[in-house]
């Protein structure tokens, strides 16, 4: 009796699974589509700005036809669809997966570029970096990750069509990070945390020696040493400032570090 009941239940479950599978297939209009047709439709959705629908089609293509040129191209375009949806983590993950699986693919430079772009928080903009509100706690890791990815792209693919833009973004990142450190150093100085101000200013000199922010970083060091009554170090810093930036506005006008940054340059 128990065996019969068990067989009956298993049969019922099997029928239910088949039924559900059939129902799911009936709801999928792409079930009989070729790889070419799915890709073409996904591309059309992408061009129309329907990135979520395009992503679903690319996923379907990769699941059904995991091998061949359409699948690999779908992987690349999937990165872009995630990026345009604002799913930056997914875009980065997809780019990493493509780079690892297809290191010699002709389009791998695009994967590097999109990974860098996803990390490069384009919505933050310059004024996000200038803001003092939470700069001391701001996470700069995405910027640094973007820089390293763009650097790898530029190094490995110097002739890539994405390299010129990557170089521009790398320069932006360096200046943005340097500005962030200078603002943080100024923040520490205002709160009489002079040693912390010196340490942050030194980071600008060591990490971003060619950035325009070096000038103010040296000035903050000089003023911080002065506030700590470290006369020799303060004089040395002012001497370096005078040598490297003889026309420095900090030497001419001696603006207060407590003066808002925008008043110093306007």
Predicted regions and their residues:
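Bacterial N-terminal signal peptides
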Residues: 9-17
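Acidic, polar-rich low-complexity tracts and alpha-helical solenoid repeat scaffolds
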Residues: 16, 20-266
């Amino acid at each position: 009796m128990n065996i019969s009941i068990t067989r009956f239940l298993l049969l019922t479950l099997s029928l239910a699974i088949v039924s559900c599978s059939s129902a799911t297939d009936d709801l999928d209009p792409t079930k009989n589509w070729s790889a070419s047709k799915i890709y073409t439709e996904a591309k059309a959705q992408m061009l129309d700005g329907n990135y979520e629908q395009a992503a679903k089609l690319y996923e379907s293509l990769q699941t059904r036809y995991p091998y061949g040129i359409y699948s690999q191209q779908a992987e690349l375009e999937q990165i872009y669809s995630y990026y345009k949806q604002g799913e930056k983590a997914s875009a980065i993950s997809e780019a990493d997966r493509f780079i690892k699986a297809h290191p010699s693919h002709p389009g791998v430079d695009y994967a590097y570029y999109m990974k860098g772009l996803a990390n490069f928080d384009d919505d933050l903009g310059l004024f996000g970096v200038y803001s003092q509100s939470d700069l001391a706690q701001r996470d700069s890791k995405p910027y640094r990750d973007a820089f390293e990815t763009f650097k790898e792209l530029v190094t490995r693919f110097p002739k890539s069509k994405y390299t010129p833009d990557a170089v521009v973004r790398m320069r932006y990142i360096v200046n943005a990070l340097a500005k962030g450190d200078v603002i943080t150093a100024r923040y520490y100085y205002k709160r009489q945390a002079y040693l912390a101000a010196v340490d942050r200013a030194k980071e600008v000199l060591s990490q971003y020696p060619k950035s325009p922010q070096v000038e103010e970083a040296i000035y903050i060091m000089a003023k911080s040493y002065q506030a700590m009554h470290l006369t020799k170090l303060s004089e040395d810093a002012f001497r370096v400032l005078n040598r490297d930036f003889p026309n420095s506005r900090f030497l001419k006008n001696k603006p207060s570090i407590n003066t808002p940054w925008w008043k110093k340059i306007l």
